[in-house]
C-alpha cells in the first residue's frame, strides 16, 4: 500500500497502480481516453493530466499524465488545479477539431465515453471553424458498423484487437492527425471477439450493427442482469429491451468470470428471442391442425390426458434452467425423469463432474485462467466450444512477457514496455485436436490426431510425470520427443492448467486430462483443471441426474410409457431423427414445452409456449460449477395481451397442481428454489446465487430501467389510449420501471446496467468495483457449488488402442463452429452470413482414393436419408476419418464418433 495526497486529502492506495487507476478506485473523477483497465497505459491521448508536486511545500508543481505515473508512497497531486483543468479542456478541444458534431444521429449517444469526458472537462463551445478531415467507412461485416470520422485516435481499438485478442486484420494506417483505423480492405472482421470493439471504443467509430436495425438510446431500454445462454461458460450479460424485443446485449462486468469481454456468439446471437415464428400461445392438435388455447384450457386439457396415461415420462434439457428441469422431475417423478442427453454425452458429463468434484484438483474461474503459466488443451477446440476460455488462454500465454517485465521491476500497467521487453515471448501452450484450431497461432506445439491418439498422448504425459500412472505402449520416438518437451514445460511451471471437455466425444480424453492433472499435483504443482461442457446448464442437469435420452426412447418404443413431456429440447440433436420420430409416434400424448419451434413439434399433441431467458428467471450452472441467476428482462404479455408465454417451471408446476387437484404452491421463483434445495442437497448453494424477492435497498426494489427512460405512457397508445399497469414482478427484487434504486454505491452485486452520475458509457463499471479492474464492490454474483476435495481420484487405467483406419469405412470427427454449432444462436438471422455452409472434410489420401477434389459433392447414407455435401480437403485430418460440422442443419452433434461406409461421389 502507498499513501498519496490528492488536493490536500490523504488516501491509502495500491502502490502497484498508476495514479489514474488509484484515483478512479477511490471514486475520484479524472477524464481519460486511451487507458483501459484491461489494456494498461500508453499515454497516447494526454487527457488524464494532473498537477504533481515534489512535496507538501511545493506550490508550483508540474503537469504529468496520471496513467503513466506510479502511485508511489508520498505522492502529492492535484486534480482540481486550474492549469491541469485548462490543459484537460484543451485536449478535448484538440480532439474535437475533427470530430463531427453529430451526437443526435450517432448511435453511441447516451452511451458515449467521449460525451462523458467532454462534459467532465467543461468543454462546451467549439472555436474551430475550418474544414474537418473525412474518411471513407468500411463494411466490417454483419456485426459492427464503422464510422471513421468520429475517431479521436486513442488507439484503444488496435491495442485491444491486436495486442489483447491477437487479431490480425485490424490496423492503423497514416500519420500525424490523419490516421485510419480499419482493415486493409472491406471485409468481415475475423476475430471471434471483434464485438468488444463496440465497448472498447470510447466514441461512435465501432457500433453494434445488430442494434442499428431497431435502434433506441440506452436510457430508453429496459435491462436485467442475465447469463449468456450460448455455451457452458456462463458469461454475465446485460440484455436491453424495447417494445418487446431484445435490442442489444452488453457485457455485464463480473470480476471473477468474464471481466470486460464477451465472445461474438454471446454478444450478437440473441436474434432467436425475436423470431416471429416462436410459439406464443399454447396449441393443441385437432386432427391435422392446431387450435389455440388459453392458459387454463391448456392446463385442463393436459391434465385430462395425463390422468388417462398409465406412465408419463419427462425429458429434460441442458439449455433449460435448474428450476424448469426440477419442475419436470417433480411432475413425472424422479424415476421417470430423463435428461434428454445422449448416453455417450451423459457418460462424459458425469465423468467431468466426478473429476471436478472428487479429483482433488482446483478448478479455476474464467478470470483465474489468465494467471496460469503453462496450458495443455486436450481434445477441445476451445475457441469454438467455449470461446471466452480461449481469450483467457491467450492472456495466460502472454503472461511470460509480464513475468520478464516484472523481473526488471516494470509495473504491470506499463504495457508498451512489457510488449517491448517480451518480444512475443510466451508461456507454453500445447493443443491437441482432430485438426487445426484457432489457438494454433500461439501454441508451442499442436498435435492433430484421432481422439484415441490424443488420449494416448495424455496418458503418456501423465506416465512421464509420474511412473505410477499407467504406461502407454507403442509410442513412436518422434512423438516421445514431443512428450518429453511437454513434460519438461508442465513440470517446470508453477501453475500448469489442463483443459478438456465433453465435446471431443471421448471419455478417454477426459480421463487422460485428469491423469495429467493428478500427476502434476503429485509433483507439488499448483495445478488447475478446466472442463468445457456443451450447453449453458449441462453441469446443472448432470448434478440433478436422470436417465439418458436412449433410455427414454426405449420406454416409448416398448410401450411402457404412453405419455411424454419434452422440455426445451430438440431431440433430433441428441439421437437419430428417425428413431425419435418413431418413438414419439407411438405415444398417445406428446407434450412439448419450448420457446423455439423445433422439429419434434410436428409430433406434438400439445405445445406449451414457454419463455426464453429474456422473459424468465432461473438458475444455471456453468462449467466450473458456479450457480448463477438470470433475471427476466421484460414481460411479453405487456405488449400483446394475447401472448401466453410462461416460465417452463410455472407451466409444469401448474400442470402438476391441476393434475393433483390442489392449489398452486410455487407462486414465485423462491418457492421453486426452496424445493430444489430440500430435494437435492448438492444444489443447496443455488439459494445464494442471488438475493430473494424480498431484497430491498432503503425500502426500494431495484430499477430495470434508467431514470431517464421515456415514452412509457405512449408505448401502447397504438393499441389503446388507456395505459395498463406496469407488469408486477413477484419473483425477484427488480421492478419493471425506472422507479427503483439504481445507485452505483448501493449494496448489491446484481446490476442490470452500468450507469453512474457523469458516467453513461460502459466505463461506468469503474464506479461499481472495489478497485478498478477488480471485483464488484459488494462481491461478484454467483456461487461455486463444489470446492476442491482433499482426497482425489485414483489414476484412470483404460488406455485406448491406437486408431486404425479401415478400408471402406470412415469415422466421423467432430468440427465445431462458433457461428452455427449452437442450437439457439444459429437461428439468429444475423448469424446466417457467418455460418459456414455444411461440408465434409477429407484427408488428401482419402480424397484421392475416392477420386474427388475440393468442391466435389459426395454422398452418404445416415438415418435412412442420403446426405450430399461438398468436399473440403483437410491436411491435418488423419486418414480414415471424415469431418462434419456439428450442429449444422441435418448434422446432429450425436454423429460424432459414428461410422460411414457408403461414402461416394454424388450423382450429378
From Swiss-Prot:
Keywords: 2Fe-2S, 4Fe-4S, Iron, Iron-sulfur, Metal-binding, NAD, Quinone, Translocase, Ubiquinone. It comes from the Bacteria. [2Fe-2S] cluster binds at residues 34, 45, 48, 67. Pfam families: Fer2_4 (PF13510), Fer4_Nqo3 (PF22117), Molybdop_Fe4S4 (PF04879), Molybdopterin (PF00384), Molydop_binding (PF01568), NADH-G_4Fe-4S_3 (PF10588). Its cofactor is [2Fe-2S] cluster; [4Fe-4S] cluster. Residues 221-277 form the 4Fe-4S Mo/W bis-MGD-type domain. It catalyses: a quinone + NADH + 5 H(+)(in) = a quinol + NAD(+) + 4 H(+)(out). NDH-1 shuttles electrons from NADH, via FMN and iron-sulfur (Fe-S) centers, to quinones in the respiratory chain. The immediate electron acceptor for the enzyme in this species is believed to be ubiquinone. Couples the redox reaction to proton translocation (for every two electrons transferred, four hydrogen ions are translocated across the cytoplasmic membrane), and thus conserves the redox energy in a proton gradient. Its EC number is 7.1.1.-. InterPro entries: 2Fe-2S_ferredoxin-like_sf (IPR036010), 2Fe-2S_ferredoxin-type (IPR001041), Asp_de-COase-like_dom_sf (IPR009010), MoPterin_dinucl-bd_dom (IPR006657), Mopterin_OxRdtase (IPR006656), Mopterin_OxRdtase_4Fe-4S_dom (IPR006963), NADH_UbQ_OxRdtase_75kDa_su_CS (IPR000283), NADH_UbQ_OxRdtase_ferredoxin (IPR054351). PROSITE patterns: 2FE2S_FER_2 (PS51085), 4FE4S_HC3 (PS51839), 4FE4S_MOW_BIS_MGD (PS51669), COMPLEX1_75K_1 (PS00641), COMPLEX1_75K_2 (PS00642), COMPLEX1_75K_3 (PS00643). The gene is nuoG. It comes from Shigella flexneri. One of its GO terms (molecular function) is NADH dehydrogenase (ubiquinone) activity. This is NADH-quinone oxidoreductase subunit G. The keyword Hydrolase does not apply. GO terms for biological process: ATP synthesis coupled electron transport. Composed of 13 different subunits. Subunits NuoCD, E, F, and G constitute the peripheral sector of the complex. [4Fe-4S] cluster 2 binds at residues 151, 154, 157, 201. Coiled coil: none annotated.
